[in-house]
From Swiss-Prot:
Family: Belongs to the actin family.
EC number: 3.6.4.-
Protein name per its UniProtKB record: Actin
PANTHER family documented for this protein: ACTIN
Length: 85
C-alpha cells in the first residue's frame, strides 16, 4: 500500500512508465528482495528496476567508492565497510 500511495498520490506518476531504484538495508534477506522485485514487476509493471544497498549509495554520493558508512535510522543502525564499491 505504501508504494501505491507513493506512486499515485505523492509522485503522481504511472509506474509502468518509469524505471525504479529501490534501496535496501545491509543483509536484507534474499526472499525480501525477490518479493520487492515481484511486486514492482507484477503489480506496478515497472519497465526496469535496480536494488542497491543504502550505505553504498551514501558513499557514492560523497564521491567515494571505499569507506565506512554509519547508517543510523529510525529503529536500527548499521556500520558498513565498503571496499571499491
Amino acid at each position: 500500500k505504501i508504494w501505491h500511495h507513493t506512486f499515485y498520490n505523492e509522485l503522481r506518476v504511472a509506474p509502468e512508465e518509469h524505471p525504479v531504484l529501490l534501496t535496501e538495508a545491509p543483509l536484507n534477506p534474499k526472499a525480501n528482495r525477490e518479493k520487492m522485485t515481484q511486486i514492482m514487476f507484477e503489480t506496478f509493471n515497472v519497465p526496469a528496476m535496480y536494488v542497491a544497498i543504502q550505505a553504498v549509495l551514501s558513499l557514492y554520493a560523497s564521491g567515494r567508492t571505499t569507506g565506512i558508512v554509519l547508517d543510523s535510522g529510525d529503529g536500527v543502525s548499521h556500520t558498513v565497510p565498503i571496499y571499491e564499491g
